[in-house]
């Protein structure tokens, strides 16, 4: 049984490092699930401590031995308590999350920003773009707006559209657009491509729902705070992905490129469409499940893709 974080704990903990160590120990003991921006107990405890103390994320190690007021320790312990007993993701406790080097507002209107696509954005999508002249890009299923806004931030000469079916998600994305001065980003309400008639792009990027029904039902409690609309995607996790593959060519230039995240549904997609030349991205951080595919490749196999999508 996890040790309760009683007010008495504040008497035994004195420094920033003390609190970080204590939080990490309690999180590990409680068997928390990590993966919402941070993948381990120590990083989560660090983020909560720095947030509660109004300190920057790049705080130098010299401050680790700074002694805290009792009221400060109690604020930190209250956050630890909620993380352990309620299983609230850290980003929803702090109200923000880092993605591609940018700090986004985060709350239950959209999934917590997290995707290996951040690495691609910061690498300029090379070598996958292969020098293409991108003028107009789309982030399909934008959620909090993190991918669209990060694309616009690192490519100020691009026009970037961010689309989503959820008005709640779009309201959060708008707040992030204002927060990060993303003047070259336009947010659009759209059910996949339905609201994007007549718009064409050189690059489409998407992190759509791709979690199978069975996996969604079995997800740890932390994921229950996120909108299910951003997770659940049918028996094999590919309900929306197949529609994207079917309809993307109508919105891509002839030399256009689609980059899409499918997570653990990668194997199922390859089994369904072995003839399609998906280029699977290898990440420095060891993640998987993101492919790049040429528009011409989708056109060449459109009939097969359309038949599979029609079965959904």
From Swiss-Prot:
Keywords: Methyltransferase, S-adenosyl-L-methionine, Transferase. InterPro entries: DNA_methylase_N6_adenine_CS, HemK-like, Ribosome_uL3_MTase, SAM-dependent_MTases_sf, Small_mtfrase_dom. GO terms for cellular component: cytosol. It catalyses: L-glutaminyl-[ribosomal protein uL3] + S-adenosyl-L-methionine = N(5)-methyl-L-glutaminyl-[ribosomal protein uL3] + S-adenosyl-L-homocysteine + H(+). The keyword Isomerase does not apply. It is an enzyme of class 2 (transferase). Its EC number is 2.1.1.298. GO terms for molecular function: nucleic acid binding; protein-glutamine N-methyltransferase activity. It comes from the Bacteria. It holds the Pfam family MTS. One of its GO terms (biological process) is methylation. Belongs to the protein N5-glutamine methyltransferase family. PrmB subfamily. PANTHER family: 50S RIBOSOMAL PROTEIN L3 GLUTAMINE METHYLTRANSFERASE (PTHR47806), RIBOSOMAL PROTEIN UL3 GLUTAMINE METHYLTRANSFERASE (PTHR47806:SF1). HAMAP family: L3_methyltr_PrmB (MF_02125). Methylates large ribosomal subunit protein uL3 on a specific glutamine residue. This is Ribosomal protein uL3 glutamine methyltransferase. It comes from Xylella fastidiosa (strain Temecula1 / ATCC 700964). The gene is prmB.
């Amino acid at each position: 049984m996890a040790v309760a974080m009683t007010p008495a704990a504040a008497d035994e903990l004195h420094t920033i490092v003390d609190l970080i160590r204590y939080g990490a120990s309690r999180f590990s003991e409680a068997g928390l699930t990590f993966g919402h921006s941070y993948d381990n107990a120590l990083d989560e405890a660090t983020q909560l401590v720095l947030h509660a103390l109004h300190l920057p994320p790049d705080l130098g190690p010299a401050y680790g031995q700074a002694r805290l007021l009792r009221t400060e320790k109690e604020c930190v312990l209250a956050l630890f308590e909620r993380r352990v007993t309620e299983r609230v993701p850290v980003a929803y406790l702090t109200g923000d999350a880092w993605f591609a080097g940018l700090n986004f507002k985060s709350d239950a209107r959209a999934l917590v920003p997290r995707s290996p696509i951040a690495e691609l954005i910061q690498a300029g999508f090379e070598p996958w773009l292969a020098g293409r002249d991108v003028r107009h890009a789309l982030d399909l299923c934008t959620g909090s707006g993190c991918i669209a806004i990060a694309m616009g931030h690192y490519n100020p000469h691009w026009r970037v559209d961010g689309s989503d079916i959820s008005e709640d998600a779009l309201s959060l994305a708008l707040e992030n657009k204002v927060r990060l001065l993303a003047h070259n980003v336009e947010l659009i309400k759209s059910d996949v491509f339905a609201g994007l008639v007549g718009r064409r792009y050189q690059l489409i990027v998407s992190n759509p729902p791709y979690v199978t029904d069975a996996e969604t039902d079995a997800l740890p409690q932390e994921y229950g705070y996120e909108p299910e609309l951003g997770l659940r995607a049918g028996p094999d996790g590919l309900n929306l992905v197949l529609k994207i593959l079917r309809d993307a060519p109508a919105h891509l230039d002839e030399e256009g490129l689609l980059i899409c995240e499918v997570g653990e549904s990668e194997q199922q997609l390859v089994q369904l469409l072995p003839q399609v030349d998906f280029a699977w991205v290898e990440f420095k951080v060891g993640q998987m499940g993101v492919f790049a595919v040429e528009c011409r490749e989708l056109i060449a196999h459109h009939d097969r893709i359309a038949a599979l999508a029609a079965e959904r």
